[in-house]
């Protein structure tokens, strides 16, 4: 990591990929296709969030159970006394979901571009993720709609914070070192 730090210090942020196994065939687990375009020198204009976000709605309960539903079908959330948090998946880390569940809330994980505003929920969490926030206009529009509810708690982390800022009217630009 010391050598990598030196390169990044000299040249700024770079896209890259970590491979865990030299025998890896380079295939994307979901599609089975070889993902040869990563890493690429292109950052601006490429929607990396779309590549890593879930493609369906996933409803997690604190007891460890979960159900899945197509993002294109109607989604019914059973009534319960637990608080419900919609998690906009921009590339969420599994530990974030575990941390929310440990706090006793239901988590409704939706794709980055899903219009969650028709759901009944108590809080909105916009996750971390890779890439350029300027490629996520659908998420920004949905977040902007949610922001009209002044009593709704909204939290964004990393990419989620940038999308929340854009929804509020901020301009986002990439710094040389991240």
Can you describe what each PLM-predicted range is?
Residues 121, 128-178:
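Cysteine-nucleophile active-site neighborhood
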Residues 114-120:
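Short amphipathic alpha-helix with an adjacent loop that forms part of the alpha/beta core around
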